[in-house]
């Protein structure tokens, strides 16, 4: 971009919510944040640090817009049959570095979905990419105590929740499972799992364009 004659670069991180990636890794990669430990870790992962004379600005993550709520509302509506009998559980990656930001975003999203659909019970859990799925299981169990049917959606860009759920269920298989013979707390629950994440959706594409354009307009 510098060689092409760009006078300014606006980097829009396609990330769900604030994390170590948005706050430290990406800025360090782009040369606008300096931390020897972060830079060492990035180099060990094969990343090449960028150093340019062109001013670089990193913008906010998706959670600062209403895009996630609007897309997940569509996912829930696709799965919903009788809102009065249903609960919704939202799963997301979460961040050990900045947990409050994720908790606020998940609470806001579930509240919005419930308000728009008439579903009266909602919960959420930060599960990484499935390594903390026991948190999801606990949320689903509790939801199933309140409602007959539990809709589970994920705030992930490229995946739904079915794959994570399948890995969890496989742990209890008699053959090849990690915990054969143990009681599966999710067995027999009436769960409806979203197969699709946030993408593909035009709202995400438009958010990228709008975010970059807004930054340029605010700071010409």
Predicted features along the sequence, with ranges:
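Extended amphipathic ligand-handling, pore-lining, and cofactor/metal-binding catalytic surfaces
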Residues: 1-220
């Amino acid at each position: 971009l510098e060689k092409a004659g760009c006078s300014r670069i606006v980097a829009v991180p396609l990330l769900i919510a604030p994390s170590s990636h948005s706050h430290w890794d990406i800025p360090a990669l782009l040369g606008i944040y300096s931390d020897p430990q972060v830079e060492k870790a990035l180099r060990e992962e094969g990343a090449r640090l960028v150093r340019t004379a062109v001013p670089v600005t990193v913008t906010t993550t998706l959670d600062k817009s209403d895009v996630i709520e609007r897309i997940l509302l569509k996912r829930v509506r696709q799965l919903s049959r009788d809102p009065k009998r249903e609960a919704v559980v939202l799963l997301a990656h979460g961040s050990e570095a900045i947990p409050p930001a994720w908790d606020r975003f998940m609470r806001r999203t579930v509240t919005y979905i419930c308000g728009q659909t008439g579903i009266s019970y909602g919960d959420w859990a930060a599960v990484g990419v499935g390594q903390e799925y026991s948190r999801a299981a606990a949320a689903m169990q509790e939801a199933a105590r309140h409602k007959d049917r539990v809709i589970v959606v994920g705030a992930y860009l490229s995946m739904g929740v079915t794959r994570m759920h399948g890995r969890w269920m496989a742990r209890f298989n008699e053959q090849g499972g990690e915990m054969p013979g143990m009681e599966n707390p999710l067995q027999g629950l009436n769960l409806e799992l979203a197969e699709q994440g946030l993408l593909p959706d035009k709202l995400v594409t438009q958010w990228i364009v709008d975010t970059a354009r807004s930054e340029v307009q605010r700071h010409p």
